[in-house]
Amino acid sequence: MAAKDVKFSGDARDRMLRGVDILANAVKVTLGPKGRNVVIEKSFGAPRITKDGVTVAKEIELEDKFENMGAQMLREVASKTNDLAGDGTTTATVLAQAIVREGAKAVAAGMNPMDLKRGIDTAVAAVIKDIEKRAKPVASSAEVAQVGTISANGDAAIGKMIAQAMQKVGNEGVITVEENKSLETEVDIVEGMKFDRGYLSPYFVTNAEKMTAELDDVYVLLHEKKLSGLQAMLPVLEAVVQSGRPLLIIAEDVEGEALATLVVNRLRGGLKVAAVKAPGFGDRRKAMLEDIAILTGGQLISDDLGMKLENVTIKMLGRAKKVVIDKENTTIVNGAGKKADIEARVGQIKAQIEETTSDYDREKLQERLAKLAGGVAVIRVGGATEVEVKEKKDRVEDALNATRAAVQEGIVPGGGVALLRAKKAVGRITNPNSDVQAGINIVLKALEAPMRQIAENAGVEGSIVVGKILEEKSETFGFDAQTEDYVDMVAKGIIDPAKVVRTALQDASSVAGLLVTTEAMVAELPKDAAPAMPAGGGMGGMGGMGF
């Protein structure tokens, strides 16, 4: 086991605080509408330029092991906030730095670290209650756009795009962000259920120009197993022919005689039909087939349910307004399933998402949820260079996460105003223990930090801005760093999701509380470089060999 270096009390806290300051100072320059960019060197390719706090935090690794421990603890704040709320990472970092700094001073003055932490926790609980009380639900698409715009660093086009995507696919729908090959940033919305299986034969194509099979007002037959012969299906096929409607068959596979017969029927015009393989594998395939059955109002023909193909009637088939199938994908639009059944299924999938511990399973369940609940939107981010596209993509992802958070828990005035106004709630708390009270006062002071930083990044004195806002009675009065004016933040559309503000403070105080109560630090001693091998002197005693 390697020897360890141990630091205690003041020395440990000083080294740790240096690490905290290095990381926080690099991250906090990005805060607010006039925040600057940070350039990050990459081991290959062009450097990365970003204004995303967590991206900066993740890149910082310090040489001194004790300083690095402080920096890594602070990095944890940014990562945790990003995981839970998807935005607010810079705010969380600024809050954590403020709490750690004041906490370290208090400990150096001889206060009890555990009592300080109790005070910090008490104050944070009061702030969170205050934020939850002030939060207003998101009422309109315009408010969604405003949240997106603020989080995308004042880019109104991104805010509008996200609002448009959310309006189309609903709050449960999936919105993904991809890089575009062109200069433009655009939204591509897929309504209905889309899955990654195309037609089994090009003979099913109805639109030769686009090479797609388009079926209107279509019946959907869902079968769990392979179809190799159509004998058992003849009664239901005849019923479909008589109805004059097209048919989509979704099964594990359609092969041999069954596929040949369907193709011949399609070419002769007897039955307008298309066949695709079922999406997914194993248990997931069965679950997705059941989703399609509920969406289209049909039944899954499954051996588990004791159903045989020969007993299938036309009433057991699902129905949809339109189905579009290309070489690789199938999209079912406007299934005829009952709304109550779809909602029940959505509730069931949500419960599974809550219970699962696997990130992969959670992602797949969320995809299924989106396909049932609304649809999928893809925001394709364009730009002139790869560096620009990556920087813009960071901002779009932040904005998307912020708008989702706003829909979940509502909105509060932005620009650090919500935290500043929460000082009133903290100011009402008193504790007879002076050390606990000192912990409460640490949070009281830290609540000003985000607003000060936003102002300072805009080139304005932070303490003057904070003082002027606290003098005003209006709860929504704040400082617009973009125009350097004092405005009504909500009326101006400068709003933050309550969830982002709450999560930032919770995560910051949690890690900062641990740093304040640290009394010793242990790190591995650097290993001495091994001595170099002596230079080879050749073989001795070869002089008398006549060479």
Swiss-Prot record:
GO CC annotation: cytoplasm
One GO term of the biological process aspect: protein refolding
Residues involved in ATP binding: 30-33, 51, 87-91, 415, 496
Record localization: Cytoplasm
Swiss-Prot/TrEMBL catalytic activity: ATP + H2O + a folded polypeptide = ADP + phosphate + an unfolded polypeptide
Family matches, as InterPro entries: Chaperonin_Cpn60_CS (IPR018370), Cpn60/GroEL (IPR001844), Cpn60/GroEL/TCP-1 (IPR002423), GroEL-like_apical_dom_sf (IPR027409), GROEL-like_equatorial_sf (IPR027413), TCP-1-like_intermed_sf (IPR027410)
Assembly information from the UniProt record: Forms a cylinder of 14 subunits composed of two heptameric rings stacked back-to-back. Interacts with the co-chaperonin GroES.
Name of the protein: Chaperonin GroEL 3
Gene (name only): groEL3
